[in-house]
Amino acid sequence: MIEHAEVLQRGDDSGNEMLVRFRLPSGLEIFGLPTKNFYGGHWDLGPTWNYAVLSDRPFLVDAGRFGQGKKLVAMLEKIGITAADLDFVLISHGHEDHDGGLAELVDATCLNVKAHAIYGRLIKTYPAKSPTADKKDFPAKCWHCPMPETFYTQNCLEYHNVLQGLKIDPIGNGANEIGPDIRTAHLPGHSPDCLAVRLGDEAIIVGDIILPDISPWPTRKSLFNEVAAVIDPPYTDAAAIFGLRCYIRSLKKLIKIASDAPGLLVLPAHRFYYHGRWNPVDLENRAKELLAHHIARCGAIIDILKNGAKTAEEIAAAHFEKDLLEGYGSIMAANEIVSHCELLIESGDVVAVNGNAYAATGSMQFETDIQEEI
């Protein structure tokens, strides 16, 4: 059981349908409201944990995936919270399982929306700036989606369309903060707009930046080139908001936060309750585990390349378990490999060859670079 947690309604073994109250020593109450995802199999995330924070300015963090907005309103009402009780909804980052229900939620509640400034730019369409013709009707945040056209046309177009009219109040980087004891931290890498919400020295809502049980998916640094036209200026440095190295810096910032405020209750967006048990997160230890995970993956990639140059898909096939490569899993795995190869290229341990393949150089500088990254 998680300290300070009171289960108000039990759900299934993944946490779906649960209602949980966290009452902190200061008296601050936070409600965990997990909404369903359609993902399954070996890439299953479990539900998205949205949180209602009953501070001086009560607010909601995240809105679940597409179609879950009204469900989230019903969950709030079940614990005695109405739209009139909330000041705004804050989006931790612009992935569909976090903002998919946003438009429906806003339509039902008229809540103001806060998110990082990058989010506000990426949810808009820019037909003249789209990198490919098939993406001109999709917002900029969809331009870098690795899924095939058949997937995003069938599953994503309506979701993207309903976000277009939303007004986003930018928050983060010290701008428009919630209060003296409630601050956001911009921690990109998994997504360029990732925010964590620190609730004094008692708790931190981390979205997908750090998760129990599974490792968050790092972006590729090269994705910056596809959206630079709509976020530059002021975001001119790809390494500041995209890529594995960026994600590693965010993990180290979380380690610093944990050092400054030991004992923080960590409220993640997935796998908080899974397989019928709680998965508590020690912020410092989990961040260090994830750093070690990425160091090990870089080493594994170099070992695979000792037998000759390979594409990202070939490296993924050699590195990941076969069942993780089924369906769209192969695309996700290849993206993961590319993000690591980008870092290995910067460290001088790997070079790009033949357009789409990678070869080892014989050096092993990456671990030193990761450990020294600030």
Question: Over which residues does each language-model region extend?
Answer:
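Metallo-beta-lactamase
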Residues: 67, 181-288, 292, 298
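Residues at alpha-helix caps and immediate loop-helix transition turns in enzyme cores, especially N-
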Residues: 45, 71-72, 101, 282-286
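Conserved beta-strand hairpin/beta-sheet module of binuclear metal-dependent hydrolase folds
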Residues: 17-83, 196-213
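Active-site HxH/HxHxD metal-binding segment of metal-dependent hydrolases
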Residues: 65-70, 77-178, 210-212
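Aromatic/hydrophobic pocket-lining residues that form the small-molecule binding cavity
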Residues: 99, 247, 251, 337
